[in-house]
């Protein structure tokens, strides 16, 4: 089994096509703590609204757009024409699947993990999938309410400090699990590159004999889309299966 290049995760995302409490169609605003994320737009028109210590910003999205952002940036996808489809590329595969995100619920819903999960409709393991479209919509709407409050606070000269502090308290207990996942997964790909460079320094070529091709096999079970934070998801598992050679021995 082999990780995707750079230890990333890939997800096909069809952004929700229902309006939020402010009338804008789109997904649930949230942020990540240890992973950068990129959006490669393959269809439709929309935007990503963001909040950071620099305030509010909106970036237009269309087919071919590529945008990315670092941990701490609160982001909300807007599906302007109802057709927005994206490949989401997530750093550090394994961490997002194990809870590296917090939705922008109003601060009173971030009091503790039990309170947060109750309103987020998440599994205890930290899954980002809801169990029904109604649950996903309710969660999205609550996150939008919190997002709008944070935006107003920033516009009035406030900061994100209180929200950030409470969000970190929610995810801090997961740090040791995330560290283990990172050390045994994405970080190991960096060490492997170092090993390759060490080989090149000495002029060795033997490691090239281990080159192989991998794929994520088509599996009907994997084609069943899940309800995520921003839309319906089709995940591509980060570990691919080797494609067996059919060549006759020479």
Where are these regions (language model features)?
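Short acidic-glycine-tyrosine-enriched beta hairpin
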Residues: 51-71
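N-terminal regions that are enriched for targeting/export leaders
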Residues: 2-15
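Short, conserved beta-strand element in jelly-roll/cupin
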Residues: 33-48, 90-91
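C-terminal non-catalytic accessory extensions
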Residues: 181-250
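Conserved short histidine dyad/triad with adjacent acidic residue
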Residues: 12-32
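Short, charged beta-turn/beta-strand-edge "cap" motif at the junction between a beta-strand
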Residues: 73-76
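An accessory alpha-helical subdomain
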Residues: 124-208
